[in-house]
Regions:
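Short glycine/serine/threonine-rich phosphate/pyrophosphate-binding segments
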Residues: 1-7, 67-80, 84-98, 109-113, ...
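N-terminal phosphate-binding or glycine-rich loops at protein starts, especially the Walker A/P-loop
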Residues: 1-31
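Solvent-exposed alpha-helices and their adjacent loops that cap or buttress functional pockets
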Residues: 14-15, 37-38, 62, 66, ...
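Glycine-rich phosphate/diphosphate-binding loop of Rossmann-like nucleotide-binding domains
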Residues: 19-21, 26-30, 133-198, 204
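Short beta-strand segments
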Residues: 22-24, 46, 87-89, 116-117, ...
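N-terminal short beta-loop-beta anion/metal-coordinating cradle
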Residues: 27-54, 108-111, 115-119
């Protein structure tokens, strides 16, 4: 449904210095936009007649539905017609369109889902939050670096702390993946503070 995205877009252009392109069925988006007062030069619409549902296989749907909103938006991003892309649709389709259309940053082995969670010390990031089922140590190191860059550039934290989720704070705790990742994170160009337990996330022990 377009209600929440349209309302969010209207609020964003009023409160922030941004221009937004809403991608979807034009007549539906226009009808929803008509209920709001907003600067017309700040919001435009790109028509996309197809939708990828949560019941479809993401990669197959992205390849076959060329006019799906997430595919149209990803192509616009690749062409330089936008600086960022937001989606409230099928997460798998968003990941697939990012990989198949936009592509990965050079040197990055895998994409990751980053979730900002509330904590006792403000928003904290959990990365990866579900994009990968099996990872290697080098993947986790890259996730830590990407998360650190985001927290510095978007939330303005000068030297974000990075923790490694484990079943104990001591360096030797955790499964084999955790143990192999720990020394690599120590050498990485980030502010690594060691292992943190699950309770450390809501307590804000790491950024």
């Amino acid at each position: 449904a377009p209600m929440a995205p349209v309302e969010a877009a209207v609020r964003a252009v009023k409160e922030l210095d941004v221009e937004i392109v809403l991608v979807g069925k034009k007549e539906v988006v226009e009808k929803e936009l008509s209920a709001y007062d907003y600067p017309n030069d700040k919001i435009s619409i790109a028509n996309a007649d197809e939708v990828i549902t949560n019941h479809e296989e993401p990669a197959k749907a992205v390849r076959s539905k060329k006019n799906a909103s997430v595919v149209v938006a990803a192509n616009m991003l690749k062409k330089g017609e936008g600086d960022a892309m937001l989606s409230m649709g099928n997460t798998g389709a968003l990941l697939a369109s990012g990989l198949l259309i936009v592509g990965r940053i050079k040197g990055i082995l895998r994409p990751a889902l980053a979730t900002l969670l509330p904590s006792a010390k403000g928003p904290k990031m959990l990365i990866d939050a579900g994009a990968n089922t099996n990872c290697k140590p080098e993947n986790l190191v890259q996730f830590g670096i990407m998360g650190s860059i985001y927290m510095k550039n978007v939330l303005g934290i000068e030297s974000p702390t990075v923790g490694l989720m484990s079943n104990g704070e001591e360096e030797g705790k955790g499964d084999e993946l955790t143990k192999e990742t720990f020394p690599l994170l120590k050498k990485a160009p980030i502010n690594f503070i060691g292992n943190i337990e699950a309770r450390g996330v809501p307590m804000g022990e790491a950024d």
